[in-house]
């Protein structure tokens, strides 16, 4: 007898926080075991079905597509706690495995999964019997594990109920119903098996044996238990002591012979139960039409009756280019017309005319409806056709863009055009698309959030019951990897040879070498930590949860539910269960509709400038050589300027001193981790300013590299170099670009040979070509997409232009739209530096947003007051327009009879100073709000609730901070600045501060929360606010116990600590190690000068130079010195000899700071 077997009950990584089987690893193991077919049955979804199908087919293994559905015995519409006929809580649901036999079955499976989310979601996506009756055709059913309905009743010896459900399921599935048996050594399962065998005989239903595989190898069992602990938010110790029956099960992906041995003699008919898995395999189709689709599924675009798609695109492109030429936005030359014709031929030949027509349609609709659209994004800027028909607004020929960077004729794949829209109106464009192509044909797109290295370490440590610090120490050693800012994986940190890592990320990455060695050393020194890392390694990369893609939209030619399974989130938004990559492979049109706030701001600025100055700015026609713009950039005054506002970017601008649009483009491409760390940026700056000669590898490359002073900055430069030197076709050049960018080793090896051979054949010396290839490998991976950089460079230039020429309008709009408190505070500070006075809110003068009064005053907007909001602010402004003005508080309340104007709103307005024009103190007005019930409550019943006791003395600054988010008439730190003498770091400077490096902060405690830990200790979390920003601070129990008397709401404190990144939320927090009153701190710091050295500075000669400065400026009555050295894991304070005192005047401090050393006096 054949001892074959097929797994039909198997959970991949898409059984979220339950299945620990990665599909790629499953395929390798299935091939190793000799499986002819493998089935999948993820819980309640089909997220992984297409990926599973393609991966198995690629290795010649038959994929069997199934789903372990959540099934309710009641109605899927029921939402009560207990809705089923039995006493099983529907919160946990029943299970039923459904397998697609054929195309009809797959469509029905997708339909059931879709409806489970759309109609049946209650804790889990559920289906019911009614849906099975309607969509059961083409499906095979297995009765599942102990949570299956018949299995559950069979396990508790309620045989009649089990029989009833077997009969009901048989009515739908007939011979395609199988009663599922498992050999998992659970007593209830053994009872269920015995009863199900008898029921099978009685009703002529077949039995089937399954493994219910949840992890790949037997040794993965512990990692799976950890995964379950994460799902249930418990530790593994809590699970083992609780009612967790699965902890002793064998749930690995076993080979056939293991399954035969496992079931041998367990029950009557065990051989047939195993062989029935082969029967199911034979019943299922070898392939599915939906998954094998080789055409592009584009929605139908209506063209004039006498035109084809291709003819109509050509007509629009020629017409559009002529209009661009007439407006001076393109040249009427042979180069333009030949490029247009070439692109049209490629587009039409590849079958993408419809794609271009669809995209230009909704973009031009947006423009006609006054919805701002970005000038371009990504590689689409390389297309002249896109420019001609209005998809982009950047001339690709003028800027040297390559069409093949966007659409490679040698590699047929759907074009990818992402579009930026005004943030406030993005949804209108999507709604236009829904109305044009059908609401059922348009959906958002799911994204799978996977377990990444750092967070996985912390998760696993928590599940293992290990201290947070154990995993945190390891997580902080994981460095950033490539130019996209991703982190090294655990596989790389723990297993990959260091030489390979340096080859991949660059020989200059000594931080990677040091951190990897330290990471491995820690693992070897502790068996517990080694187990932590090896467990995390198995879970890294699993899908943790899903969310909706921020911008992705898919548009189909027919209802999407006929093509893919759909998902509905908690808000009812519909999305595909497949992500963007899978949708593209299936031939569907997916687009990124991005909302860009800056486009909204530019629109508002333009309207305000026209209103106040009568100037109608056309941003596309602005001269790109405006002196005021470049002066602003060179001085680093770019707070609020698109893409140029970070502290690091400001410093780069000051060093680079841009004086042309090309410099702005280059800055956007260069300000990324790779170029900054590799030295490319320094080389660019030195060459620009003539401090280093501009060199080209070959004279022929000067036209390509001249704009960037011989430095490879753009991907397009790499492509052009390969064409000039090696004779690459445009398509081959793009393949090279992709190989370098994606670090594809196999493809890189092929392209290297082709590059060198081609250049040598064209007469270039092999040695020099090989050296150039090494440089390309080293630096080209840092290169950036020029078309994207240029498009965003325009937006940067436009915002800088408004700031330089119309600063009042710039700040009024930016302050209105900025929701981030830190950025808002920086804008306030910047506005003051530009000479503007920020006026407090006034109920008779403030608008909804910030407004300009006179030449240099900006009035606070009502909507920015916490507790008011935009909708209420609009109601107030409308009432004021009607009544002209409000005489006072009572008059305001009488004239704004609206339920939105409640006690909370009025109190917020008073606290913000909106009634200060009455000359009455805020304390008095607040008391009136609380106590003048008779006078104030006449307008509304119970408007203000019960009267309060007399209001205590109030601090106006505290009130302002509470409702405005910052202090407007002063600052609590004003009283301490002289005392502290700037011996602390401004919070805004932390943006560029090294994580884990110690800092001293001074500020006001706000939003204080004291929490009780699991151990019964207390800790604190609060925001610390200074004049430059705010940061969340965490005070752990030990520190809190020592400093709790100082930690009070609204108190000014000095804190020492370090920055720490919360990897789950990506928020940066400040971990407090010490807390002082300003007086205590000033006393401790008196006559002391602190110098902070990094480890590399201590080693590379800076220390010697520092010593020289100290020796030259010693004095008997100077400052004591404390030298702090950052050694990476910890800091060392070196108190220098008492007689070593320093004359600490400003010149000496500046001399020390020029060494790149931080000084605190």
From Swiss-Prot:
Catalysed reaction, written as an equation: DNA(n) + a 2'-deoxyribonucleoside 5'-triphosphate = DNA(n+1) + diphosphate
Signal peptide annotation: none
EC class of the enzyme, as a word: transferase
Cystine bridges: none
UniProt keyword annotation of Nucleotidyltransferase present: yes
Keywords, sorted A to Z: Cytoplasm, DNA replication, DNA-directed DNA polymerase, Nucleotidyltransferase, Transferase
GO biological process, one term: DNA replication
Gene Ontology molecular functions: 3'-5' exonuclease activity; DNA-directed DNA polymerase activity; nucleic acid binding
A Pfam match: HHH_6
Major location (coarse): cytoplasm
E.C. code: 2.7.7.7
GO cellular component: cytoplasm
Keyword Electron transport in annotation: no
Compartmental location: Cytoplasm
NCBIfam families listed in its UniProt record: polc (TIGR00594), PRK05673.1 (NF004226)
Subunit structure: DNA polymerase III contains a core (composed of alpha, epsilon and theta chains) that associates with a tau subunit. This core dimerizes to form the PolIII' complex. PolIII' associates with the gamma complex (composed of gamma, delta, delta', psi and chi chains) and with the beta chain to form the complete DNA polymerase III complex.
Similarity section: Belongs to the DNA polymerase type-C family. DnaE subfamily.
Function: DNA polymerase III is a complex, multichain enzyme responsible for most of the replicative synthesis in bacteria. This DNA polymerase also exhibits 3' to 5' exonuclease activity. The alpha chain is the DNA polymerase.
Protein name per Swiss-Prot or TrEMBL: DNA polymerase III subunit alpha
């Amino acid at each position: 007898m054949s001892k074959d077997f097929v797994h039909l009950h198997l959970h991949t990584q898409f059984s979220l926080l339950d299945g620990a089987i990665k599909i790629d690893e499953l395929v390798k193991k299935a091939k190793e075991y000799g499986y002819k077919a493998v089935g999948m049955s993820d819980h309640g979804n089909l997220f992984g079905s297409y990926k599973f199908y393609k991966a198995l087919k690629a290795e010649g293994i038959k994929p069997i597509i199934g789903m372990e559905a959540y099934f309710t015995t009641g109605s899927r519409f029921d939402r009560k706690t207990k809705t089923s006929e039995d006493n099983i809580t529907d919160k946990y649901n029943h299970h039923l495995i459904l397998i697609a036999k054929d195309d009809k079955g797959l469509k029905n499976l997708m339909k059931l999964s879709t409806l489970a989310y759309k109609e049946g979601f209650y804790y889990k996506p559920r289906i019911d019997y009614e849906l099975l009756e309607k969509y059961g055709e083409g499906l095979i059913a297995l009765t599942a594990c102990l949570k299956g309905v018949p299995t559950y009743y069979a396990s508790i010896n309620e045989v009649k109920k089990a029989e009833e459900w077997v009969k009901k399921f048989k009515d739908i599935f007939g011979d395609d119903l199988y009663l599922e048996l498992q050999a998992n050594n659970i007593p209830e399962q053994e009872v269920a098996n015995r009863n199900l065998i008898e029921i099978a005989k009685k009703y002529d239903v077949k039995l089937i044996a399954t493994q219910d595989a949840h992890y790949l190898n037997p040794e993965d069992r512990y990692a799976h238990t950890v995964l379950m602990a994460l799902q249930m938010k418990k530790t593994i110790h809590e699970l083992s002591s609780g009612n967790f029956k699965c902890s002793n099960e064998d749930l690995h992906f076993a080979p056939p012979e293991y399954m035969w041995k496992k079931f041998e003699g367990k029950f009557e008919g065990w051989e047939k139960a195993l062989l029935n898995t082969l029967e199911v395999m034979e019943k299922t189709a070898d392939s599915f039409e939906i998954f094998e689709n080789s055409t592009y599924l584009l929605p139908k675009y209506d063209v004039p009756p006498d035109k084809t798609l291709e003819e109509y695109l050509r007509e629009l492109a020629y017409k559009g280019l002529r209009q661009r030429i007439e407006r001076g936005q393109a040249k009427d030359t042979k180069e333009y017309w030949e490029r247009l014709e070439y692109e049209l031929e490629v587009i039409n030949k590849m079958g993408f005319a419809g794609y271009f027509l669809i995209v230009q349609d909704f973009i031009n609709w947006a423009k006609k409806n006054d919805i701002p659209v970005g000038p371009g994004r990504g590689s689409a800027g390389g297309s002249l056709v896109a420019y001609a028909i209005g998809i982009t607004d950047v001339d690709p020929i003028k800027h040297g863009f390559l069409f093949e960077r966007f659409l490679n004729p040698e590699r047929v794949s759907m074009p990818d055009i992402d579009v930026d829209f005004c943030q406030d109106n993005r949804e209108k464009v999507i709604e236009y698309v829904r109305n044009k192509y059908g609401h059922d044909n348009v959906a958002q797109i799911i994204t799978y959030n996977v377990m990444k290295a750092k967070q996985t370490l912390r998760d696993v440590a928590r599940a293992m019951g290990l201290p947070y610090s154990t995993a945190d120490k390891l997580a902080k050693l994981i460095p950033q990897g490539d130019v996209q800012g991703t982190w090294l994986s655990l596989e790389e940190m723990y297993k990959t040879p260091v030489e390979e890592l340096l080859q991949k990320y660059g020989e200059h990455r000594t931080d990677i070498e040091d951190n990897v060695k330290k990471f491995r050393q820690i693992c070897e020194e502790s068996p517990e930590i080694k187990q932590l890392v090896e467990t995390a390694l198995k879970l890294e990369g699993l899908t943790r949860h899903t969310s909706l893609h921020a911008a992705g939209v898919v548009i189909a030619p027919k209802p999407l539910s006929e093509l893919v399974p759909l998902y509905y989130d908690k808000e009812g938004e519909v999305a595909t269960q497949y992500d963007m990559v899978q949708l593209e492979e299936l031939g569907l049109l997916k687009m990124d509709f991005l909302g860009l706030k800056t486009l909204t701001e530019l629109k508002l600025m333009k309207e305000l400038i026209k209103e106040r100055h009568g100037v109608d700015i056309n941003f596309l026609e602005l001269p790109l050589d405006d002196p005021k713009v470049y002066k602003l950039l060179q001085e680093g005054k770019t707070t609020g300027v698109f893409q140029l506002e970070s502290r690091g970017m400001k410093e780069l601008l000051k060093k680079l001193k841009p004086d042309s649009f090309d410099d702005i483009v280059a800055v956007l491409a260069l300000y990324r981790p790779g170029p900054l760390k590799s030295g490319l940026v320094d080389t660019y700056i030195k060459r620009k300013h003539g401090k280093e000669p501009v060199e080209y590898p070959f004279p022929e490359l000067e036209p390509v590299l001249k704009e960037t002073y011989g430095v490879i900055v753009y991907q397009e430069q790499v492509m052009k170099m390969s064409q000039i030197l090696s004779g690459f076709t445009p398509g081959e050049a793009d393949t090279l670009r992709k190989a370098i960018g994606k670090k594809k080793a196999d493809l890189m090896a092929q392209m290297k040979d082709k590059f060198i051979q081609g250049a040598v054949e064209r007469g270039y010396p092999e040695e020099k070509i090989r050296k150039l290839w090494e440089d390309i490998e080293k630096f080209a991976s840092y290169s950036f997409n020029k078309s994207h950089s240029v498009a965003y460079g325009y937006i940067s230039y436009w915002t800088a232009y408004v700031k330089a020429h119309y600063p009042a309008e710039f700040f009024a709009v930016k302050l209105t739209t900025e929701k981030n408190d830190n950025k808002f505070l920086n804008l306030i500070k910047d506005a003051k530096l530009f000479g503007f006075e920020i006026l407090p809110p006034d109920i008779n003068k403030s608008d909804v947003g910030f407004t300009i009064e006179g030449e240099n005053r900006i009035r606070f907007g009502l909507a920015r007051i916490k507790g008011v909001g935009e909708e209420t602010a609009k109601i107030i402004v409308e009432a004021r327009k009607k009544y002209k003005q409000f005489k006072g508080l009572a008059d305001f309340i009488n004239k704004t009879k609206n339920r939105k104007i409640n006690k909370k709103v009025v109190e917020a307005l008073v606290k913000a100073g909106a009634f200060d024009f009455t000359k009455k103190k805020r304390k008095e007005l607040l008391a009136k709000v609380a106590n003048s019930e008779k006078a104030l409550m006449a307008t509304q019943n119970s408007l203000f609730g019960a009267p309060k006791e007399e209001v205590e003395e109030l601090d106006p600054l505290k009130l302002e901070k509470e409702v405005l988010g910052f202090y407007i008439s002063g600052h609590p730190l004003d009283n301490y600045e002289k005392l502290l003498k700037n011996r602390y770091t401004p919070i805004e400077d932390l943006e560029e501060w090294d994580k884990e490096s110690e800092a001293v902060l001074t500020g006001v405690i706000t939003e204080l929360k004291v929490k009780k830990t699991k151990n019964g200790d207390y800790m604190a979390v609060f925001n610390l606010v200074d004049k430059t920003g705010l940061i969340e601070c965490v005070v752990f129990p030990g520190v809190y116990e020592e400093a709790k008397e100082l930690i009070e709401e609204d108190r000014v404190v000095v804190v020492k600590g370090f920055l720490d990144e919360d990897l789950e939320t990506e928020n940066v927090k400040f971990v407090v190690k010490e807390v002082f009153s300003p007086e205590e701190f000033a006393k401790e710091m008196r006559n002391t000068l602190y110098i902070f050295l990094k480890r590399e500075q201590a080693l590379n000669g800076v220390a010697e130079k520092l010593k020289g400065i100290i020796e030259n400026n010693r004095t008997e009555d100077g400052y004591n010195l404390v030298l702090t050295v950052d050694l990476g894991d910890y800091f060392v304070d070196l108190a220098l000899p008492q007689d070593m005192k320093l004359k600490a005047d400003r010149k000496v401090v500046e001399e020390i700071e020029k060494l790149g050393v931080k000084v605190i006096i």
